């Protein structure tokens, strides 16, 4: 007989971790666990009060059966032993013996993981405990007095371990660390030593001596080569082969050496592996998908008790790929649902998956044209954005849509053109891109018959949905089907590809929600292209691409996640509909004026009480992935909101003057009746504890649930009746009393003095010096029946819960509309909070295109500056008698760019519906804002700085309309002065004469000031400059006389940041060089060269003027005007 193995005793009333979700139970009658985790057979003697004894194995004993089950039923194969570094028990590698005493004696998850309080008595009755059927291997140390022999045996084993592990220090890794640290630190995981080589020879050498479980994993991996598999093995999730190396790098966990590929490293008999605890799966899955990996969860699809009762008890546990996730499809992030705080750092994540396809390029060079189709879906909220458009060689249209949508994942159908491919790589290829994180890119082929196949697949998909939902809404669903079938060919191709793609992740149901399809190109919003979003810092700042300092950051005072998402849409798509805009502005004004009134306080209080992301939770309900506590939170939150406004029967009952506010508030109580009907069916206390067995009230439980509960009750009655029969066999008059030790129930304790009365058919489970504990054959049989009922009950509870979620999903549209109205109220209250800031005013809107602002300020800089921001006035209008363009000059760092951004941002704020930072604002509705600011090259399109500058300018000239605002900053600086001036003057003249839009033109070319004289009325273009003061040798120098003696390096420049009439005759570049601490010797040389060049230029101008004078004297009147202009410039 081999040497006994020590199995630690761990008190555990029941193992609820067989079910998902779990509930916690406190241990009872626990024996203390061992103080350390010594290697196999290296154990210390137990205490004198409780010494484990060797289990007696009889022909009728269940111990052999359980041991066979511990090996996954693989009687013909030898399993490798594994030595864990942080567990106190010895478990078989396959981890499939769910009912093993060794497995059940493991350290159970803490109560903080499984629930904050004990389940109800009703639930305890149905909790499955695999321990109850186990025969714990707790052998007694028979040779306790032979200390010398024991020491020699330990020393021999130690030498073997040293030889096996390579060096003595390696064994330190098997010492368990503090369990509290394991619970508290996400990076400390269950680690394993490399398994010892199997000494016995196995059959099937051609399979590389892999275990049946590893062969299962290998088979799944072959079918999903692009997926990182996370495999459930007992109480852990494990990674194998190359997946283990990848996971170890991302998660900072230990990778146990072994073969990384099946077809390589033939000298190794086992795969490399890494493992994580079961309760840490959501955290690590989120980290893996955030790193850009596609992960698959492989779960055991059968449980120990049902497997033992079935015909396949001698085969490994069946494992299947149950879930696949990527960054865009990971909707199981429960942590993110309970917080209203935005993620810190990085760009705001939208969670969109974007599918893109395009036709082959037509034309060549700058005449290249491509037709593009996009479809973006947000699985977490059910929103869709689609578009079909033509784009030029700069791909500015694609860039605009990508920056607006900010996808977290791309699906590319077919091949993209070279320019588009480079754009996608540029925007997503690094961790420092404008989206704030690395973007995952997947590709699918595009055969020549893709269009026809896509129409067929989409039509079939929605036709099947229509058949499956024959109801009163049949007409509405038919209308949605027709809407989908009217989509253009490129969009249909994207839709078909996306349906196929989402089906792999089990999220194809999101395409039922075609009500929320939205076209990006719908001209009901102001167009903000990609350059404008970046230049004006709409979503992120230009310094570190974070949200702080952006326009969205300035306006975001929302209290809910879904309100924050809606506000982001509002910021990127300012309104063009004057009626809707005035309704929104009026609502904000009313909320601002009534900020401390009871009705507004009630709205704020209601939003503050929303602790979860209702919009995402609703989609999880729709997908059938919602947890019981999450469902309870959603239903109770919706009930609380409905009760708060139960008195509102019609919109006028809300008590507001604003139609928008009244309609939003009136929609909130509509959901009350539906929510209450669902809450009446569930047990709130059980739902809060994630208790599946008591979730439904008894009258609403399904027949199957009741049947299995009755079965469990009958078995427990049989166990109670068996007490008398057991007592009679022990010659006792009173019924025996069952005891529970280390989580093993229904033990019969017999004093060692009465062991001769115990029948041989009784299986000894454990014992002490004074007592022994047994299971009778009848108890083993009853417990097996009870466990089968419990596992069937667990499955029935899960099935009933999914049916309950499906029933709630039938009211998806009503609940979604209520949440949307709640988000609208959140956004309006956020804008009202901004309007309450000092110095903000309500804008008024006109039918003409104009911008008339008094005392305007930059909304973001004002909040970031510690000092007061200097306000400025602006007056632009497309009326013939007014100025529609400003030519802005001034010294470097004088505030020119901040001023033009301020004008644009005030226009955007007004059309969002917000108050604006100004004393007064009278604005027309702009259909677009176009900017050309900054200097940068474009390596991904192989374009120089000047090429990018002119390409963007050309795009603006083609796109701008008389209702647009165009901002051009230092156009022409990327080339020589003469060419730059020529291009800048031509563009300025075209914008003012031909396009006739509002324009702000910044330049350092003072000669452009003469363009204003070329207009008949002299008002269309006006020269302004950023005011400043200059002191030279203690004397103030006026702007008019600033350039008489050239620039002096010792001049002190004071920026006034005010807009004044006229032209600034100098840019004071040397002043900026001095502020930048350029060496004084360099500054002196630069000042000298500057004076020389200016003198040379003046000399040339004088020479030219002298020639003109001679021509004028010869009666050449045509040159008289040129003469006058030249003299003014001098």
UniProtKB/Swiss-Prot annotation:
Residues 80-89 have a biased composition (Basic and acidic residues). Residues 140-149, 177-194 have a biased composition (Acidic residues). One of its GO terms (cellular component) is nucleus. Residues 8-20, 44-63, 109-135 have a biased composition (Polar residues). PROSITE patterns: DNA_MISMATCH_REPAIR_2. One of its GO terms (molecular function) is ATP-dependent DNA damage sensor activity. It is found in: Nucleus. Residues 1-152, 168-207 are annotated as: Disordered. ATP binds at residues 890-897. Keywords: ATP-binding, DNA damage, DNA repair, DNA-binding, Nucleotide-binding, Nucleus. InterPro entries: DNA_mismatch_repair_MutS-lik_N, DNA_mismatch_repair_MutS/MSH, DNA_mismatch_repair_MutS_C, DNA_mismatch_repair_MutS_clamp, DNA_mismatch_repair_MutS_core, DNA_mismatch_repair_MutS_N, DNA_mismatch_repair_MutS_sf, DNA_mmatch_repair_MutS_con_dom. GO terms for biological process: mismatch repair; mitotic recombination. Residues 207-328 are annotated as: Mispair-binding domain. Coiled coil: none annotated. Belongs to the DNA mismatch repair MutS family. MSH3 subfamily. Heterodimer consisting of msh2-msh3 (MutS beta). Forms a ternary complex with MutL alpha (mlh1-pms1). Component of the post-replicative DNA mismatch repair system (MMR). Heterodimerizes with msh2 to form MutS beta, which binds to DNA mismatches thereby initiating DNA repair. Msh3 provides substrate-binding and substrate specificity to the complex. When bound, the MutS beta heterodimer bends the DNA helix and shields approximately 20 base pairs. Acts mainly to repair insertion-deletion loops (IDLs) from 2 to 13 nucleotides in size, but can also repair base-base and single insertion-deletion mismatches that occur during replication. This is DNA mismatch repair protein msh3. The gene is msh3.
